[in-house]
Every structure is written in C-alpha cells, then in structure tokens.
Amino acid sequence: SYVRDNNGSITYAELSYLEERGVKAAAVSNPAGKYVLPSPTTSAVWLDAAEIAADGLVTQNFAAKAADAYPINAVSYGLSSTAKSATNASVKSFFAYFLDVCAPKNAAGAGYTPLTGSILAKADAQVAKINVG
C-alpha cells in the first residue's frame, strides 16, 4: 500500500486494514488529553458514551473525557423496516445474534469493535423496535 511504502504518509483506514498490511497506527489525543492507540478496547470505551437517536442514528460524544478512549471511530449500521411483517422475525433474530453472540466472539479478532455496555443496550433497544407481527 502507498502508506506502508512511503514513510510519513497519512491516511484514515479501518484498524483491520492496518493490521492486515502491517501499517502502524498513530496515537491520537482524546478529550481527556491522553494519546491513545486504536484498538477494539479503546474504541469500545469511546463508543460507550455515544447516543442513539429514536431513528437509530448514532451521535458520538466528542466531549467525553474517558482517559482510555480512542476518539476516531466509524459506526456501521444494520438497516431494517420496523413495520409489522412476518419476515421481520428472521431480520430481528439476525441482528440480535450479530450484536449479542457473533460480534463479542469475533469482532476484535477481525480488527473491529464489538459493542459493550450502554451502547450495546441502546443497540439492542433498536433491534427490539423491529415488529415481527
């Protein structure tokens, strides 16, 4: 990759891409004034302060002062209709499995952050809105 092969280059990429390509990440200063490297753990600390609106959009709290929080994170969304539907049972089951079983076991090993704590509870509350009919 260009960044790996050109000393001093800067880019933004998912942690999994950096790990796959052997590219070093920079420690970033967070609102607590501490320089923190990206990891599933430091991202989880940051995301725990995020809010989820009624429509499911995540707002990161850029004033959160957790000392071990890495402040540069992207959020992936699972999208579904919440309207009553018999087929929503499978969709709801998939999202619940992904958040509560698959991600905790596999996300960190793939360079991603499983949701934990209050942000996981908020995500589970969004899944609960899927009306299975």
Q: Which functions belong to the PLM regions below?
A:
Residues 1, 47-68:
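Cyclophilin-type peptidyl-prolyl cis-trans isomerase
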Residues 1-50:
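Ligand-binding pocket segment of bilobal, Venus flytrap-like solute-binding proteins
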Residues 10, 15-18, 37, 47, ...:
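Generic detector of leucine side chains in alpha-helical contexts
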Residues 10, 23-28, 54-61, 73, ...:
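Generic preference for hydrophobic/aromatic residues in regular secondary structure cores
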Residues 39-41, 52-62, 84-90:
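Phosphate-binding glycine-rich loops and adjacent basic patches that engage nucleotide phosphates
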Residues 62-133:
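Extracellular/periplasmic juxtamembrane helices and adjacent flexible linkers that interface
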